[in-house]
Amino acid sequence: MTLTDGVLVIFIIALLGWAIYDQWGTERRHGKTLLRVPLLKRGRADSLIFTGLVAILIWQNVASHGALLTTWLLGALGLLAIYLFWIREPQIRFKREGFFFAGGWVKYNHIKAMNLSEDGVLVMQLDKRRLLIRVKNIDDLERIYHFIVNNQ
């Protein structure tokens, strides 16, 4: 196994670990999920560039008769990228004491202010940062508001 293959294996394991954690780990941490809201997908251009670069690397490796293991690892990385960026639906998961957003846990008592922007983005001001929550369905904003008001 070359250094390139080792780096690819590390990236594949990291992305696979993130996908499993995001899909099933956040579902089980900090108690039962009381409200799950789908979010808009972001970074389409970045994901297209990354997937395209992986495809170019696969083509280059095949054209130059590179190692078969490298081709398979690049293919696995490409499939993981397609799943993470194009198939998986990002979600915000509300629990009894807080919520998961972008893989991070936020307790309700850290929310200092909530505002709704003109374009339908829920802005939550936390102690040290601001969260921009873009929901897929605009009606979900009302569900989020009522859930937070009733559960604090």
Curated annotation (Swiss-Prot):
Protein name: UPF0266 membrane protein ESA_01432
Membrane topology, record value: Multi-pass membrane protein
Keyword annotations from UniProtKB, A to Z: Cell inner membrane, Cell membrane, Membrane, Transmembrane, Transmembrane helix
Sequence similarity: Belongs to the UPF0266 family.
HAMAP family cross-referenced by the UniProt entry: UPF0266 (MF_01071)
InterPro entries reported for this sequence: DUF986
Membrane-spanning residues: 1-21, 45-65, 67-87
Keyword Transmembrane listed: yes
Highest taxon of source: Bacteria
Subcellular location: Cell inner membrane
